[in-house]
Each structure stands twice: as C-alpha cells, then as structure tokens.
Amino acid sequence: EQWLPQVCTRIEALGSYRERIVTTAIGDNQASFLGAAGNENNTLLVNMGTGGQISVLSDQYFTAEGIEARPFLHGTYLLAGASLCGGKAYALLEKFFREFVKEATGQEKPLYKTLEKLAGDGKASCTGRENRKKLQIETTFDGTRVHPEQTGSITNLSTDNFTPAAFVYGTLEGMSRELYQMY
C-alpha cells in the first residue's frame, strides 16, 4: 500500500469530483502567480499580505541569499523573495496612530482611510527630495528570513520630515524597498 502520492513534474488530471476535474496540487505561490500573472517569462508579481512576496518567472534555476527557486510549469521556476513584515508593518503603523488617538481623545476607530490620505500627502512632500533628506524607514521589525536578528529602524529624521505624512509614506516606501532589494 502506498502512503504518499507519486511525484510528478507537471499538472496532471487525477480524476473528477462533482463533474469538476481534480488535478495534482501546486504551491500557493505558484497558484497565485499563475492566476495573477500567467506564465510569461520575465513577469514580476508583488504580493503584500502579512508578509510581502516578490516573484519572477524564469526559465533558469537560480538561487541567491534570500531567494528561493520554486518549480513552476513546463520546466520553469519562480524566483521568490519574501519579507516577514509586509502588510504587517502598515498594520503596526495604523495601530500606533490608533493608540495615540485613543489616548488623546478616548475614541478608538480604524485609521486606514486617514493613513491613505497621509500617504498621498507624504508622497507629494517627498517627490523630488534627495534620498538623504527623506525619512528612511526599514520595516524589518521581525527580522528577515536570512537575518532574523535584524530589527527595523528610522533614519534621516529632520525638522522637515518629522510629520505623520512622512512616517506613513516612509513605511510604505520601506515595505516596497525591502522587496525591491531582493529583486
């Protein structure tokens, strides 16, 4: 008696259930990439959930620190990098502001709409500004997969950028930058 299924190299039909074809499984990253981006080479997909993920389709196997080569369709690979604090960093920022507002006013309500407005204001105030004058937020609050001991940081604080808008925009930029550096 066989306890584990046979390993296969492609999606195969296994049978049907309620008149639907049942196939071999693929990983969640592979399934989301296929559904969102298809199977074109050099296509890049960014997912932002609790963590963040950047995936690119390649016909060549490749590994680097922090990058996994995951099998995909027809002998291709998804090169995937993942951050531990993707959307979690934004949720942490919202919680920070919500706790401040509750302390100041006694009211507690979600502030994501306010953060969205502040992000736009932050982008407008940062556009064209030199990097050394922009608030830099590293959103590695829970470390990284390669360096779990790493922590987040805020640098380049000045009287010009010590604003809620700069913090919101800087957090979003930090979330994006962490994934971009993997690419």
What label would you give each PLM region?
Residues 8, 14-183:
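Active-site core segments that coordinate phosphate-bearing ligands/cofactors
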